[in-house]
């Protein structure tokens, strides 16, 4: 399977191409007197070393590219790898079922939880059906319906954030996009069950915040969280999207910086090369973090849970 190497990964791609070429030669002519195994292993070791070197010094713009990687695991991938017995729930009971938001009941280590997350698409048809992970108001109203259901049945809520932003179309605005986002922000702050939010890819503006108010907010190592995309910021400040790398650095969109500012709680390490290189490994790391967060929140009474969430929200800007 092609890993869809990004521009800054091209030296790695060239090494991997050499490895594939040598392996292909070995398969085509098994009678070769030359043993290629040692050379293949040498190149593999070199590839790992090069990958480690490149990924040890990534800039914010490179991380933004990784956050958008077409093979990066999406919400439904984590549902399969982390949870069991998932039963998807659909519709906002008012207008439509927005496929850019998925949600339903599942089990985390036999414990019922409510899962809600953005869902992008892989192939063209699915991308269109999912609206490229940009929810309309009915998506956020569906999310709120599921949150209220979780509260009614005393189930923890686990959200996965991965969107370039809420859909800015005319129809979405006519149906109350800003109201839907604002209502979610208000209602999530008062939910009487644990809420754990994790940014797994792009955390774009209000579209991310609408399912991002929680007791714990985590980010994967190569995810981003920002009020606007680097391209959008560059277009406003420098009148050119070409300045996106400069904007990404200035905006502080990466996980370590956001943890330093106390806007998030934990950074979940990704496998070498990014989450798409080993979906099962990142699934295991995510599961461990979710279980640890739930264990911490389970020690609180409902009053303590709400008070701690309130204090957490009010502390923003005082890092």
Curated annotation (Swiss-Prot):
Belongs to the AccA family. GO terms for cellular component: acetyl-CoA carboxylase complex. One of its GO terms (biological process) is fatty acid biosynthetic process. Component of the acetyl coenzyme A carboxylase (ACC) complex. First, biotin carboxylase catalyzes the carboxylation of biotin on its carrier protein (BCCP) and then the CO(2) group is transferred by the carboxyltransferase to acetyl-CoA to form malonyl-CoA. The lineage of its organism: Bacteria, Pseudomonadati, Pseudomonadota, Gammaproteobacteria, Enterobacterales. Its EC number is 2.1.3.15. It is an enzyme of class 2 (transferase). It is found in: Cytoplasm. Residues 35-296 form the CoA carboxyltransferase C-terminal domain. SUPFAM superfamilies: ClpP/crotonase. It catalyses: N(6)-carboxybiotinyl-L-lysyl-[protein] + acetyl-CoA = N(6)-biotinyl-L-lysyl-[protein] + malonyl-CoA. This is Acetyl-coenzyme A carboxylase carboxyl transferase subunit alpha. Pathway: Lipid metabolism; malonyl-CoA biosynthesis; malonyl-CoA from acetyl-CoA: step 1/1. The gene is accA. Pfam families: ACCA. The keyword Nucleotidyltransferase does not apply.
């Amino acid at each position: 399977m092609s890993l869809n190497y990004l521009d800054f990964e091209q030296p790695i791609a060239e090494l991997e191409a050499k490895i594939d070429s040598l392996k292909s030669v070995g398969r085509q002519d098994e009678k070769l007197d030359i043993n290629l195994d040692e050379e293949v292993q040498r190149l593999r070791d070199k590839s790992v070393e090069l990958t480690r070197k490149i990924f040890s010094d990534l800039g914010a713009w490179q991380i933004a590219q990784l956050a958008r990687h077409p093979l990066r695991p999406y919400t439904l991938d984590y549902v399969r790898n982390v949870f069991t017995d998932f039963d998807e729930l659909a519709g906002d009971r008012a207008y439509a079922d927005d496929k850019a938001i998925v949600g339903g009941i599942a089990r985390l280590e036999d414990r019922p939880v409510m899962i809600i997350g953005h869902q992008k698409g892989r192939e063209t048809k699915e991308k269109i059906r999912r609206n490229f992970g940009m929810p309309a108001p009915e998506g956020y109203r569906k999310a709120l319906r599921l949150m209220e259901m979780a509260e009614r049945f005393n189930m923890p809520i686990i959200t996965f954030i991965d969107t370039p932003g809420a859909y800015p179309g005319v129809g979405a605005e006519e149906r109350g996009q800003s109201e839907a986002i604002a209502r979610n922000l208000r209602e999530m702050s008062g939910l009487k069950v644990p809420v754990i939010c994790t940014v797994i890819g792009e955390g774009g503006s209000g579209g991310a915040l609408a399912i991002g108010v929680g007791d714990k907010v985590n980010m994967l190592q190569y995810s981003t969280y920002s009020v606007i995309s680097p391209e959008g910021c560059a277009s406003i400040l420098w009148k050119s999207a070409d300045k996106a790398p400069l904007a990404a650095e200035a905006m502080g969109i990466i996980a370590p910086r956001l943890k330093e500012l106390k806007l998030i709680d934990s950074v979940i390490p990704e496998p070498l090369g990014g989450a798409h290189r080993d979906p099962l490994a990142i699934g295991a790391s995510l599961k461990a973090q979710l279980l640890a967060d739930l264990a911490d929140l389970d020690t609180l009474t409902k009053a303590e849970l709400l008070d701690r969430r309130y204090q957490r929200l009010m502390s923003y800007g005082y890092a």
